[in-house]
Design a protein with these regions (language model features):
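Metal-dependent nuclease catalytic cores that hydrolyze phosphodiester bonds in DNA/RNA
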Residues: 1-134, 141-157, 161
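An active-site-proximal "capping" alpha-helix that borders the catalytic cofactor pocket
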Residues: 163-173
Length: 173
């Protein structure tokens, strides 16, 4: 832990744990609006299985993308917990941004980007930027943070979700 943003966030959280901090009404309202937007996206009725290349899937194995596009009927049904997991991630992102703001950490908010690759355009929306670098908010266990997300090398060596490709796509766009 040595990045100034991380230090500021930990200080803010320490203050909160010791009843020494408050949240502005503006920040609380923004967190609520962000969660409302996430609910609208998750329960908006759009078919999330329609295939298209997007930043969130470009790092996945090519064979998985091929099957997603050409044989979607062979996919296993999504578990009933899928939408809840997506919602928890959206809530974590909304609260995290509120914490950053209250800790005095400057960050760039979500932005939609497009990357032209050959004849295709890949679209996506990244979570935030800190110090001009694209970053992605993840909800994960303490074990995951210590063992999976500890460094770029650790993440790249054992990740099956395409996080590295996703971040490279956002940063390149």
């Amino acid at each position: 832990m040595n990045h100034p943003a991380e230090l500021a966030l930990h200080k803010h959280m320490d203050d909160a744990a010791n009843d020494k901090s408050t949240k502005s009404q503006e920040t609380i309202k923004q967190i609520g609006l962000d969660v409302m937007g996430a609910l609208a996206r998750q329960f908006g009725g759009a078919d999330k299985r329609d295939f298209r290349l997007r930043m969130s899937n470009i790092g996945r194995p090519t064979c998985q993308l091929w099957f997603d596009k050409n044989k979607p009927e062979t996919a296993l049904p999504r578990p009933t917990t899928f939408v809840m997991n997506m919602m928890l991630g959206d809530i974590v992102e909304a609260v995290f941004k509120g914490l950053l703001k209250e800790a005095g950490v400057e960050y760039g908010d979500s932005e939609s980007v497009s990357l032209d690759v050959g004849e295709h355009t890949i679209n996506g929306t990244y979570d935030l930027t800190i110090d001009g670098a694209v970053d992605d908010v993840k909800s994960a266990s303490d074990w995951s943070y210590r063992n999976k997300f500890a460094s770029f090398e650790t993440l790249h060596s054992g990740e099956a979700f395409g996080y590295v490709g996703q971040l490279v796509g956002y940063a390149t766009a």
